[in-house]
Amino acid sequence: MRHYEIVFMVHPDQSEQVAGMIERYTGSIKDSGGQIHRLEDWGRRQMAYPINKLHKAHYVLMNIEAEQSVVDELESTFRFNDAVIRNMIMRAKNAVTEPSPMMKAKEERFTKRDDREERSDRSEAPRAEAPAKAEAPAKAEDEAAAE
């Protein structure tokens, strides 16, 4: 069996169907004796250039180990599925299991956001209240009444 890296882009209007598509594709790979080493759903992203007047697409990355017949079946499935805008299947020398640079950047953004939320939670701690300045307007009213 050979190793492959597969990236496919799904029409943005069909984003809710991506989970089902991934399940079907992974099922066909596993049923034929293949393995999935890495599966990443990058979500809806801006494309580098418009394709079919679309500016965004839902991206999915898979690193698999499978027979050529399985890859041929996946390729024909991509070709006849109207929701798949583009796909790329590349043969790899070995299995890639570590997160892609896209996912590393996404994780860094989430950790930074979590840190910001944690700091904002600390800043919302109860503070000593400043004394009310209600006396100043009352003096002005008293002076106006005295005249």
UniProtKB/Swiss-Prot annotation:
GO MF annotations, alphabetized: small ribosomal subunit rRNA binding; structural constituent of ribosome
A GO cellular-component term linked to this record: cytosolic small ribosomal subunit
Keyword terms of this UniProt record: Ribonucleoprotein, Ribosomal protein, RNA-binding, rRNA-binding
InterPro entries in the cross-refs: Ribosomal_bS6 (IPR000529), Ribosomal_bS6_sf (IPR035980), Ribosomal_S6_plastid/chlpt (IPR020814), Transl_elong_EF1B/ribsomal_bS6 (IPR014717)
Biased composition (Basic and acidic residues): 104-147
Highest taxon in the source lineage: Bacteria
SUPFAM superfamilies, alphabetized: Ribosomal protein S6
Gene3D superfamilies for this protein: 3.30.70.60
One Pfam family it belongs to: Ribosomal_S6
Residue segments, region Disordered: 96-147
GO terms classed as biological process: translation
Family per similarity comment: Belongs to the bacterial ribosomal protein bS6 family.
Protein purpose: Binds together with bS18 to 16S ribosomal RNA.
Matching PANTHER family: MITOCHONDRIAL 28S RIBOSOMAL PROTEIN S6, SMALL RIBOSOMAL SUBUNIT PROTEIN BS6M
Protein name: Small ribosomal subunit protein bS6
